């Protein structure tokens, strides 16, 4: 099995990606388990931040690296919280504080204007100086609810309603979510690219 560092400290992302990637023969090790500090996310896009994170993890560990940068873009908010999704409520942000801030910010947004989209960019670097990283993007349309529902998932999942499923992302099973989510889409593209060379 090929050891690969996953450039995140987010336990939800580690669980979600590690289980799917282990089926592909990749031994995923979280960067925190290797003593790697988080890279500074100075990019202006999900793609830039994912490359920064992967390059940092590969450089520190000497291993191939996979990085994920993802977030929620709400149409009525001009794409916010976007790349700031994890820090939306400030320095001491938590999933709950971010979710509450978004609900408060959107309290006057009419129901027919609450469209949003989760985005996920996965980057694979074969080594720290890899000039041609694999970059895969997935997006998942939904609607921001007025109240949380469900206990699964993480982040904004309890207020992200998926019309095709008739429930929030937090009400989906892990298998259901992986099959249709932004991260599931990006991962499928990454696995296809790895498989084909």
UniProtKB/Swiss-Prot annotation:
InterPro entries named among the record's database cross-references: dITP/XTP_pyrophosphatase, ITPase-like_fam, RdgB/HAM1
Gene3D superfamilies linked: 3.90.950.10
EC number, UniProt record: 3.6.1.66
EC class (word): hydrolase
Keyword Disulfide bond listed: no
Free-text remark on how the cofactor is bound: Binds 1 Mg(2+) ion per subunit.
Active-site residues, record numbering mapped to chain: 69 (proton acceptor)
Gene Ontology molecular function: any one: ITP diphosphatase activity
Binding site for substrate: 8-13, 70, 154-157, 177, 182-183
Catalytic activity as recorded in UniProt: XTP + H2O = XMP + diphosphate + H(+); dITP + H2O = dIMP + diphosphate + H(+); ITP + H2O = IMP + diphosphate + H(+)
Cofactor(s) it depends on: Mg(2+)
Entries under Pfam families matching the protein: Ham1p_like
Annotated GO CC locations: cytosol
Keywords: Hydrolase, Magnesium, Metal-binding, Nucleotide metabolism, Nucleotide-binding
Binding of Mg(2+), residues: 40, 69
Complex and partners: Homodimer.
Family: Belongs to the HAM1 NTPase family.
Function: Pyrophosphatase that catalyzes the hydrolysis of nucleoside triphosphates to their monophosphate derivatives, with a high preference for the non-canonical purine nucleotides XTP (xanthosine triphosphate), dITP (deoxyinosine triphosphate) and ITP. Seems to function as a house-cleaning enzyme that removes non-canonical purine nucleotides from the nucleotide pool, thus preventing their incorporation into DNA/RNA and avoiding chromosomal lesions.
Protein name: dITP/XTP pyrophosphatase
Organism annotation: Escherichia coli O6:H1 (strain CFT073 / ATCC 700928 / UPEC)
Gene symbol of the encoding locus: rdgB
């Amino acid at each position: 099995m090929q050891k690969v560092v996953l450039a995140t400290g987010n336990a939800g992302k580690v669980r979600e990606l590690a289980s799917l990637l282990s089926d592909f023969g990749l031994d995923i090790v979280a960067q925190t388990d290797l003593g790697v500090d988080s890279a500074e996310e100075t990019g202006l896009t999900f793609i830039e931040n994912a490359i920064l994170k992967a390059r940092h993890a590969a450089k520190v560990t000497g291993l191939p690296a996979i990085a994920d940068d993802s977030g929620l873009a709400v149409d009525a908010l001009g794409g916010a919280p976007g790349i700031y999704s994890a820090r939306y409520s400030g320095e001491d942000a938590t999933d709950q504080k971010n979710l509450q801030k978004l609900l408060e910010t959107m309290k006057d947004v009419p129901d027919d204007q609450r469209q949003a989209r989760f985005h996920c960019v996965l980057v694979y670097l074969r080594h720290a100086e890899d000039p041609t990283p694999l970059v895969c993007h997935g997006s998942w349309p939904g609607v921001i609810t007025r109240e949380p529902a469900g206990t699964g998932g993480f982040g904004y999942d309890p207020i992200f309603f998926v019309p095709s499923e008739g429930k929030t992302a937090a009400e989906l099973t892990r298998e259901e979510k992986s099959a249709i989510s932004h991260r599931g889409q990006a991962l499928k593209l990454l696995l296809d690219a790895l498989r084909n060379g």
